[in-house]
Each structure stands twice: as C-alpha cells, then as structure tokens.
C-alpha cells in the first residue's frame, strides 16, 4: 500500500499525525456521537445548533444527532447515522463512502459501511489524502502552514490543531530518523 501511494516520510507524517488525532490515538475508528449534554453538542456544532435549547432533543441520542448534522448533505438522504465517520480519518457521508468504494474496488463497503471502520480503516485515510490532494500539500514540508491547511481539509475547521501539529512533528521526527 505504501508503495502505491509513494509514502515519503513527510507524507507519512502528515497522514499519521492527522489520523492519530481523528482516531483518538488510533483507538477510535467509528465516530462517537453520544453526547450526554446539549451544551457539548452546541459547542461541537455551533453552526447547526444556535442555542443550547436547540441541541436539547439530541442529547443521549446518537442516531437522531447524526441524522440532524449529516442528514440531507454529503449524499445522505436522511441517513446520517448510517454514513457517520469511520476509519482513521473518519470518512463521513454517503458520497465519500461511494467514491472510496468505487475507486478502491470495494463495493461491499456500500452494503456494510462498518468495513470502513474495521477492515479498511487505514485504506480510507490513504484514499482521503489522495482524493483530496493532501499528499501534494504534504510534499511542501512539515510546517505550521501545511499542517493547518491539511487540518482544514480533513476537519472542515481547526479543531485539535495543536495536537495535530504536535503529532505530525513527532511522527516526522521518527520517520526522518529511520
């Protein structure tokens, strides 16, 4: 796999630094959408929940929350929970699953999306980097700017930027030493 994607140390550092953060240290390969308080929901998705009261019905209800935040976009037709984030970079949305399954010749992912969390967690991350031209950015070096730009594409914002920077730099040091 690494040969197919020509994983240089810089590319590997960016990929693994982002994956480390998104997966909680490579421990979480399926998006956890169980939030016990509406305050936390509103803090995580302020653009979807203007007030804490708006988030109240979604606390302790991951399926309902996923349908609210992911339903009707990214190719989802009200099936946000089915197409929630999975894999080391949290592949999200029916459109992304469809593209991944097609380009990687893994049609079974469309009938069993949990495969993206289990058997293909690393492949989803590689595919996402390639499909979104993130390896091209990674080739520019391991800098604040490149980590920030890749984070924006992976996360849609800058959530966890400090950790992503720390992990990417640490992994880059290890890979460059070897």
Residue ranges and their predicted role:
Residues 9-24:
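Active-site-adjacent structural elements in enzyme catalytic domains
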Residues 20-128:
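Peptidoglycan-targeting cell-wall enzymes and recognition modules
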